[in-house]
A protein has these predicted regions:
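C-terminal target-recognition/interaction regions appended to catalytic cores
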Residues: 98-229
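Class I S-adenosyl-L-methionine
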Residues: 1-143
Length: 229
């Protein structure tokens, strides 16, 4: 939005005034192997007196944003992703040919053994609306609220505020905290404590940066700073 843009540009001006050169990129979590369509603007800066020739004015040079990416967005968009399938509770299907399985919801559910995860039973149970849940096709994420994920596709952004509800691909319920953590590509050993409220668990997960994205950017920063020595 215009308000967010104004805040962002003011933040950059403050960094320039404090003696930093910066680089920025609109990055999608899919590029780093996380199974969710999540765009974020990333900004990285270093004090100018540490950069030598690695800058041009306020622009930081030589930062290889793509170094640890697994995919390009153009490649991702070109795969033959399935669209929608009639919801069938408990159904079992195979990954379609030509689809990168490691970018799919089902792959990460299995990878993180979500059925046996400490947060497996942490999900909101609706007071009503079960019939409505059953009417939504697998993969129908076109609505503002009730979005049913497709097991052989990536997820929309893992964020559940503003009445956004994500449904399990082949179960009559919302996603569990264990499943949401898996879509954030966290190690399967990572769990949220029992004394957190369900609301705070999902808020914490939604506010997080996908693990594979943050790991890739952290390695890029490490390599860049090592190159300045």
């Amino acid at each position: 939005t215009a308000r967010h843009r104004e805040f962002y540009e003011e933040l950059k001006r403050k960094l320039f005034h404090a003696g930093y050169s910066t680089t920025e990129r609109l990055t999608n979590a899919l590029e780093y192997g996380a199974p969710q369509d999540r765009d974020r603007i990333l900004l990285f800066g270093v004090q100018k007196d540490l950069l030598g020739e690695q800058r041009k004015g306020n622009a930081l040079l030589g930062f290889d944003w793509q170094k640890y990416q697994s995919y390009t967005l153009s490649d991702i968009r070109s795969f033959p992703w399935p669209e929608t399938t009639a919801f069938a509770e408990g159904s079992v299907t195979d990954c379609p040919e030509g689809v990168p399985e490691s970018l799919t919801v089902e792959y990460w559910f299995r990878q993180n053994d979500v059925e046996n995860h400490p947060n497996a039973n942490d999900y909101f149970t609706p007071r009503g609306g079960i019939a409505k849940m059953k009417d939504i096709d697998e993969g129908d994420d076109s609505k503002k609220s009730y979005k049913r994920l497709h097991r052989w596709r990536y997820s929309p952004t893992v964020a559940y505020g503003n009445n956004e509800v994500h449904l399990h691909p082949y179960k009559v319920r919302r996603l569990s905290a264990a499943e949401a953590l898996a879509l954030q590509t966290l190690p399967k050993e990572f769990a949220l404590p029992d004394d957190m409220t369900l609301t705070n668990k999902f808020k914490t997960i939604g506010n997080g940066v996908p693990y594979l994205l943050s790991s890739g950017i952290a390695k890029t920063i490490r390599d860049y700073l090592n190159g300045l020595k």
